Amino acid sequence: MNQNKNNNNKNPKINLLIIGCGCIGLSTGIIALKSGNYKSVSIWAKDLPPNTTSNKAAALWYPFLCNPLDLVGKWSAETMQYYKDHIINDPKSGTITKKVNEIFRRPHPEDPEWKPYIKSFRRARKDELPDGYVDGYAIDDGFVMDTDMYMDYLVDQFKSLGGIIEQRHLVDIREAFVDHDVVVNCTGLGSRELFNDRTIYPGRGQIIVIKNSTDRSIMDEEDHIAYVIPRLTNTVLGGTNQEHDYNTNPTKKDTEEILKRVAMISPRFAKNRIEIQGVKVGLRPARHEIRLENEFFEGGSKLVVHNYGHGGSGFTVSWGCAIEAIKLVDQGLPKLLHFNKLISKL
């Protein structure tokens, strides 16, 4: 999709509403505004930065806890390219390039399904493997985001392009339909209630933010989750993925277990060598696969484009999914407009 403004879209301009103000909703809004195809673009959300799930994420570019893997690969590659073209050179974004290693204690001869989409993918060298690890992957040009800086950056970008943000909690999608014919649903876990999607559930993630730093991200998700993610101003240690757990309070038990696992993949981050700055908990929008599709309501007179269920890969697929979501809006508009034209003649 062309990120520059264009008037090639033959559909009449409409007022577009996006529900949700995490990295998915904001990215989608920015892509919509850059297209120049909409009369206005607004975001309604129950929670705004810095109080979103996105603000509590480790924010490493790497496909993680997300399906379907073939499309995740495509959207991840598109997101990586967007970071390179539009974000990485802006210091206000809090985004930096860091090498990423995923490591394995057992031989892992198969490559990930998303490998064909990532040109920089390679097998890890022996010198990149900690003691006790025998195999691994490497990406030399991955990205990490300081989440608070990055989310503020997205808000500023959205508003500077003319976007409007309103803190508003929807309990019924029909509230949105009063003034909008097209809505993009980026509510994540909120889709469980707003759209009665019982296939989405929380994947509780707890992270530890420390002052120390390192030169690469490293992760082990083979048996238990352990990762070290150096960001611009701090480093994140993680983590957990406790399915169907709604507890948003940090627990001492999880903190202790995270520190033990992290010390195994990177001994320099043993408990007695780090300075803890904080502990955060976020609920990942876990689902069997990302939902990115059109759904018509009220007999075909209203269109909802769903863009949720990104699991642990929200920052990894955000721009690719945003581009796809706006394509779906444009594809659904002719049917919507045809239906409304017929109704107006009755």
Curated annotation (Swiss-Prot):
EC top class named in words: oxidoreductase
Keyword terms of this UniProt record: FAD, Flavoprotein, Oxidoreductase, Peroxisome
Primary localization: other
Keyword Iron: no
Residue ranges annotated as motif Microbody targeting signal: 344-346
Positions that bind FAD: 22, 24, 52-54, 58-60, 187, 284, 311-312, 314, 316
Annotated InterPro entries: D-amino_acid_oxidase_CS (IPR006181), DAO (IPR023209), FAD-dep_OxRdtase (IPR006076)
Localization (cell): Peroxisome matrix
Cofactor or coenzyme needed: FAD
EC number: 1.4.3.3
GO terms under biological process: D-amino acid catabolic process; digestion
Protein residues bound to D-proline: 227, 284, 312
Annotated D-dopa binding sites: 284, 312
Cellular component GO terms, alphabetical: cytoplasm; peroxisomal matrix
Substrates-to-products reaction catalysed: a D-alpha-amino acid + O2 + H2O = a 2-oxocarboxylate + H2O2 + NH4(+); D-serine + O2 + H2O = 3-hydroxypyruvate + H2O2 + NH4(+); D-phenylalanine + O2 + H2O = 3-phenylpyruvate + H2O2 + NH4(+); D-alanine + O2 + H2O = pyruvate + H2O2 + NH4(+)
Binding locations of D-serine: 227, 284, 312
Gene3D superfamilies in alphabetical order: D-Amino Acid Oxidase, subunit A, domain 2, NAD(P)-binding Rossmann-like Domain
Family: Belongs to the DAMOX/DASOX family.
Protein name as catalogued: D-amino-acid oxidase
Annotated source species: Dictyostelium discoideum
